[in-house]
Design a protein with these regions (language model features):
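Long, histidine/aromatic-enriched segments associated with O2/redox biology
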Residues: 1-143
Length: 143
């Protein structure tokens, strides 16, 4: 499991045209619909964070929680990600910060700065599934 705190330069981000923001993220802003694969920039956030091996996507369960302290003018997100292997998370971070290929980094990092974080071992569940009664839940065997 990885946890990271990112601070965002919202003034600089909001100064960008919407089309540029969409190119950086790889999604349409008003609808949040993912752009078609051939329309995405190679440095789009959702391209570089998609990890594949042998043509198969390697799953990472991800979530972001926005936060803000108006008095400090500090705004950002806490990111948390779970994966079967830390190799998946390391590959995602390498793609984002170094680039794939090197130099083709995630342009969202021009506006977001990781200020803290950690990588933790979390033991698996016995059944391989986690969820409430009556619902399938998340299949952690894929992660």
């Amino acid at each position: 499991m990885i946890i990271q705190k990112y601070l965002h330069n919202l003034k600089a981000w909001n100064a960008l045209p919407v089309e540029r923001q969409e190119t950086i993220i790889g999604r349409k802003k008003p609808s949040d619909i993912e752009q078609r694969p051939f329309d995405k920039a190679s440095y789009a956030h959702n391209v570089l964070t998609n990890i594949e091996e042998g043509g198969q996507q390697l799953h990472i369960l991800r979530d972001n929680m926005p936060f803000g302290e108006v008095g400090k003018g500090e705004f950002g997100t806490y990111f948390i990600g779970y994966a079967r292997s830390p190799d998946r998370i390391e590959k995602m971070l390498n793609n984002m910060f170094i680039g794939n290929p090197p130099g083709n980094y995630d342009r969202i990092l021009d506006f977001s700065t990781a200020v803290t974080g950690g990588l933790f071992f979390v033991p698996g569940v016995v059944s391989g599934r986690c969820g409430s009664a009556g619902r399938e839940g998340v299949n952690f065997r894929k992660l």
